[in-house]
Amino acid sequence: MRSYLRGGRSMVYWLTLPTPRSEGFGRVYRAVNAAIRRAGKRVGEGVRVIDLVPVFTPGGRFRQNVTFRGRTVSARQPDGVHLSTAGASIAATLVIDRLRADRALPRLR
């Protein structure tokens, strides 16, 4: 993460991985997410971890369908790992919201 900060001249946005259907992969994803969170805290200033887990896998459990801002969609591909187009749109919205909160993007009027 530090290498992407370019000496403090930029921001780093890192996304956690939503829990997949497979419990075996789930253990790996939880370890990866814990490492992402630790690294983000250790580096500190200039790093934002955007946590997708609460939206896509509330309670850390796989969900095919999620409700986001009042709309329920099938958020995952049939493989139980990848996001569907609707799921990717939700993830993009979360990233855009964070960028706007950081004033890295203009707010909509």
State where each predicted segment sits.
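Catalytic His-Asp segment of secreted/periplasmic serine-dependent ester chemistry enzymes
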Residues: 20-109
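A short helix->loop->beta-strand "cap" motif at the edges of active sites that frequently abuts
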Residues: 6-11
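Alpha-helical scaffold elements within enzyme catalytic domains, especially in hydrolases
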Residues: 3-4, 38
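Structural beta-sheet core signal
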Residues: 13-15
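Generic structural signal for well-ordered alpha-helices
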Residues: 1-2, 33
